[in-house]
């Protein structure tokens, strides 16, 4: 069954303790320190050259790759960035679009598979967090996605992504069952870790309240994610034509250790920049 279909309707309920604001703050700090994208209003408008203005607008674009329901995308927009959100689930994007309508933000949303990313211009920054990259189950899928990211990055542009480690799947969540009850819905999340393939299977069973009634609808979804090592990820980045700027433990913001569960990689486009 395709992931993030029925689950999209209750996704934000079960993710309500996710520190999106902390992520947005940290990503903004990284963009300011290492990137080239500027916030709307921070860009000097003294140039009268149309070409310069077009290039400047491309440089300042920020893409949220695997944006889901757009919570992080909205927060980055509120910080002043010109945002694009890409996700392969139309159901998730429908919720993101409803948030855009409520907030009045100018975010562009595109329904695309990140493995077939297609944009209308180059962009200054790509961010992909909340383990979106782990949904790529084969090495060649990661490499191709990273090559596409690099292809659309403005010279010197920044790619910031996170990923769940093999350690997290093997030692923390693999073969565990999690259950939660909420007023509107309940869920059972069963994990099955396949050691040889390093793939974690999520079987989700969700009971969601139907409208204003006391009736609940049951639906299920199965998700698959693959664990990667830091060495593998750095290899994918380099083969895609980018250089690694920084790697950090996503929880401590310090150098990763063997027990790191989620890792940030900050990479930069270098070939177009050098050329």
Language model: regions and residue ranges:
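Conserved class I S-adenosyl-L-methionine
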Residues: 1-66
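A short glycine-rich, Lys/Arg-flanked "PGG" loop and its adjoining helix->strand segment in the class I
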Residues: 143-155
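SAM-dependent methyltransferase
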Residues: 160-234
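C-terminal lobe and adjacent flexible extensions of AdoMet/dcAdoMet transferase-like proteins
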Residues: 224-275
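Class I SAM-dependent methyltransferase SAM/SAH-binding core
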Residues: 63, 70-116
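A short acidic, Gly/Pro-enriched loop at the edge of an enzyme's catalytic core
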Residues: 118-125
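Residues lining the SAM
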Residues: 129-131
């Amino acid at each position: 069954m395709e992931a993030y279909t029925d689950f999209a309707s209750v996704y934000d309920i079960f993710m309500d303790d996710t520190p999106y604001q902390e992520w947005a703050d940290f990503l903004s700090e990284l963009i300011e320190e290492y990137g080239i994208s500027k916030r709307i209003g921070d860009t000097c408008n003294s140039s009268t050259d149309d070409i310069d203005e077009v290039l400047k607008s491309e440089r300042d674009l920020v893409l949220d790759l695997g944006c889901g329901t757009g919570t992080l995308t909205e927060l980055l927009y509120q910080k002043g960035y010109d945002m694009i959100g890409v996700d392969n689930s139309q159901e998730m994007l429908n919720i993101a679009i409803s948030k855009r309508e409520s907030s009045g933000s100018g975010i562009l949303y595109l329904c695309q598979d990140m493995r077939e990313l297609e944009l209308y211009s180059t962009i200054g920054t790509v961010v992909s967090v909340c383990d979106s990259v782990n949904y790529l189950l084969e090495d060649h899928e990661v490499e191709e996605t990273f090559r596409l990211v690099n292809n659309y990055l403005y010279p010197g542009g920044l790619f910031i992504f996170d990923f769940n480690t093999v350690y997290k799947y093997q030692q923390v969540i693999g073969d565990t069952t999690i259950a939660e009850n909420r007023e509107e819905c309940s869920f059972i999340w069963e994990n099955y870790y396949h050691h040889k393939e390093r793939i974690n299977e999520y079987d989700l069973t969700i009971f969601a309240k139907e409208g204003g009634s006391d009736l609940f609808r049951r639906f299920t979804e199965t998700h698959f994610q693959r664990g990667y090592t830091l060495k593998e990820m750095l290899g994918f980045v380099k083969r895609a034509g980018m250089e690694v700027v920084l790697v950090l433990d996503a929880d401590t913001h310090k150098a990763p250790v063997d027990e790191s569960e989620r890792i940030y990689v900050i990479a930069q486009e270098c070939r177009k920049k050098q050329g």
